[in-house]
Amino acid sequence: MSRVGKAPIALPKGAEVNVAAGVLSVKGPLGTLSQPIHSLVKVNVENDTLTFAPADESREANALQGTMRALAANMVKGVTTGFERKLNLVGVGYRAQLQGTALKLQLGFSHDVIHEMPEGVKAETPTQTEILIKGADKQKVGQVAAEVRAYRPPEPYKGKGVRYSDERVILKETKKK
């Protein structure tokens, strides 16, 4: 059995779990998330705990048990506390600001880059060079952060660009004769 999949998920106050028609849905103060349940995984909800079991003894069922448990744990955490990624803009004249739901970035191009936020994801700019991306869906938050970073990834010589706050950019030395 999967070691990750065996661990039960404790449901915090304010989180409701519903399993119906092969779909697991979690509702909480920050919204509702749903995930289809694979046919090789059984889901049990009892006494504010969520447990997963493989439907048969195959390796695939064991692997999917751990995967489904990890996805469900992320859903429960997302609807109760949420997820966030912090990005830093490093470079002269690099700045970010919000325009409604869109993020306006000045990244050294001849034009401003405007990134529309998908539904369920919010952006904040505490300072001109910091971006906070928040949401209930871990996958969406990470995807939006990766898309914003991709506009101008950190370059290896001066380190200019958009980087995650916990990212270390290893600088190269310039070529010398």
Swiss-Prot record:
Family annotation (SUPFAM superfamilies): Ribosomal protein L6
One Gene Ontology MF term: structural constituent of ribosome
Cellular component GO terms, alphabetical: cytosolic large ribosomal subunit
InterPro entries cross-referenced by the UniProt entry: Ribosomal_uL6-like, Ribosomal_uL6-like_a/b-dom_sf, Ribosomal_uL6_a/b-dom, Ribosomal_uL6_bac-type, Ribosomal_uL6_CS
Pfam assignment, any one: Ribosomal_L6
Listed GO biological process terms: cytoplasmic translation
Keywords, comma-separated and alphabetical: Ribonucleoprotein, Ribosomal protein, RNA-binding, rRNA-binding
Subunit: Part of the 50S ribosomal subunit.
Function: This protein binds to the 23S rRNA, and is important in its secondary structure. It is located near the subunit interface in the base of the L7/L12 stalk, and near the tRNA binding site of the peptidyltransferase center.
Family: Belongs to the universal ribosomal protein uL6 family.
NCBIfam families listed in its UniProt record: L6_bact
Protein name as it appears in the record: Large ribosomal subunit protein uL6
Protein source organism: Cupriavidus taiwanensis (strain DSM 17343 / BCRC 17206 / CCUG 44338 / CIP 107171 / LMG 19424 / R1) (Ralstonia taiwanensis (strain LMG 19424))
